[in-house]
Curated annotation (Swiss-Prot):
It comes from Bacillus cereus (strain 03BB102). This is UV DNA damage endonuclease. It comes from the Bacteria. The keyword DNA repair applies. Keywords: DNA damage, DNA excision, DNA repair, Endonuclease, Hydrolase, Nuclease. One of its GO terms (biological process) is response to UV. It holds the Pfam family UvdE. Coiled coil: none annotated. Belongs to the uve1/UvsE family. One of its GO terms (molecular function) is endonuclease activity. It is an enzyme of class 3 (hydrolase). Its EC number is 3.-.-.-. Component in a DNA repair pathway. Removal of UV LIGHT damaged nucleotides. Recognizes pyrimidine dimers and cleave a phosphodiester bond immediately 5' to the lesion. Signal peptide: none annotated.
C-alpha cells in the first residue's frame, strides 16, 4: 500500500511566499480605474510567482500533492470586478502547468464553504456555478483541467436534510457537465455525515474525498470498515487513486478546530482500517503548520515497524 502526502496552499518553510495575497473590494473601490488595474495585476502576478516558488520547493522535497490557493486571483468572482486574469498571465499559467506536468504533481482546489448546491435561493446556486467556473478556468489555463479536481462540501441542511439533498441533485444539473466531471465531494464536521455524502457521490458518480477528522466529529451509524471500501470505489472511474484529508483536533473542547500538527494516535485507527483494504491512496494534510506538519507526520509514521519511506513524502506499508 502506497501513501503519498501533500499539504494546503502555503509552504511554511518558505519566507514571504503567500500565494493568496489579496485586496478587499472596499480598498479596490477607493482606487482610480488605472490603479485598480495595476493593483489586480500586481497582486495576481505575485501570487502566481509565489505559487511557482512553492512548486519548486515541493519538487525539491518530492512532495507529490498540493492544493492551490483559491485566492490566487483576487476578486476573481466579484460581480463588479472585470479582469482578464487568464490572458494577462498566460506565460505564468503555462509555467505552472509545465512544472506540474513534468514532475507529475497532483494539484487540486477547495473553494470555501459558501460554494454549495443545497440552497433554495437561486442566487446561491448561481454564485456556486460562478465560483466553480473560475476554478475550472484556472485549471484549464494551467493545462490540467482534465486531470485535476475541485473539492466542495455538500452544503447546508436548512432545517430539512432530505429536502436539501433533493435540491443538491436538482441544482447540480445546472453546473456544466465538463466542470461537474472534475468535482469531488467531502463529508463535513457538522451536517452531512460520511454515509450521507457517500450516497450522494454514488448517485452522482462524483469521487469522494474522505475527511477523517470530520468523520470523527460527525459520526454516522455505519462503521468505517464498511464505508471506506465504498468511498475508495467512487474513484474507480478515474485514473487517480483516492484522496483523503487528515488533521487532528486542536483540543477536546475545540474538537472541530485543526491542530498545529498531526496527532498520530488520533489517526492510527483510520490507518489500520485503510491497511485492511490495502489500496493505494493519497493524503492531504490540513494541519495549521502545513508542510512542516506533513514532514513531521511522515517521519513519525516511517518509524513504525512495517512502514517504509520510499521518498521524502511517500510511504509504503
Amino acid at each position: 500500500m502506497i501513501m503519498r502526502f501533500g499539504y494546503v496552499s502555503h509552504a511554511m518553510a518558505l519566507w514571504d511566499c503567500s500565494p493568496a495575497k489579496t485586496i478587499t473590494f472596499t480598498s479596490f473601490q477607493k482606487l482610480s480605474k488605472q490603479e485598480r488595474e495595476d493593483k489586480l495585476y500586481d497582486v495576481t502576478k505575485q501570487n502566481l510567482e509565489h505559487t511557482i516558488r512553492i512548486l519548486h520547493y515541493n519538487i525539491a522535497h518530492e512532495i507529490p500533492l498540493y492544493r492551490l490557493s483559491s485566492s490566487i486571483v483576487p476578486l476573481a468572482t466579484h460581480p463588479e470586478v472585470e479582469f482578464d486574469y487568464i490572458g494577462a498571465f498566460t506565460p505564468l499559467w503555462r509555467k505552472i502547468g509545465a512544472l506540474i506536468k513534468e514532475h507529475n504533481l497532483r494539484v487540486s482546489f477547495h473553494p470555501n464553504q459558501f460554494t454549495l448546491f443545497t440552497s433554495d435561493k437561486p442566487h446561491i446556486t448561481t454564485n456556486a456555478i460562478t465560483d466553480m467556473t473560475y476554478h475550472y478556468k484556472v485549471l484549464d489555463a494551467i493545462g490540467i483541467a482534465d486531470s485535476s479536481y475541485i473539492n466542495i462540501h455538500v452544503g447546508g441542511a436548512y432545517g430539512n436534510k432530505e429536502k436539501a439533498i433533493e435540491r443538491f441533485h436538482e441544482n447540480i444539473k445546472k453546473l456544466p457537465a465538463h466542470i461537474k466531471k472534475q468535482m469531488t465531494l467531502e463529508n463535513d464536521d457538522k451536517t452531512y455525515t460520511t454515509a450521507e455524502t457517500l450516497s450522494i457521490c454514488q448517485k452522482e458518480k462524483i469521487p469522494f474525498v474522505f475527511d477523517y477528522h470530520h468523520h470523527m466529529a460527525n459520526l454516522c451509524e455505519e462503521p468505517l470498515e464498511e464505508l471506506l471500501p465504498a468511498i475508495f470505489e467512487t474513484w474507480s472511474h478515474t485514473n487517480i487513486v483516492p484522496k483523503v484529508h487528515i488533521s487532528s483536533p486542536k483540543s477536546k473542547k475545540e474538537f472541530r478546530a485543526h491542530a498545529e500538527y498531526i496527532d498520530l494516535e488520533f489517526i492510527k485507527p483510520f490507518l489500520h482500517v485503510a491497511k485492511k483494504i490495502n489500496h493505494n491512496f493519497d493524503i492531504m494534510i490540513e494541519s495549521k503548520q502545513k508542510d512542516l506538519a506533513m514532514l513531521q507526520f511522515i517521519q513519525e509514521l516511517s518509524s513504525i515497524r512495517g512502514i517504509k519511506r520510499i521518498s521524502s513524502s511517500t510511504l509504503q506499508w
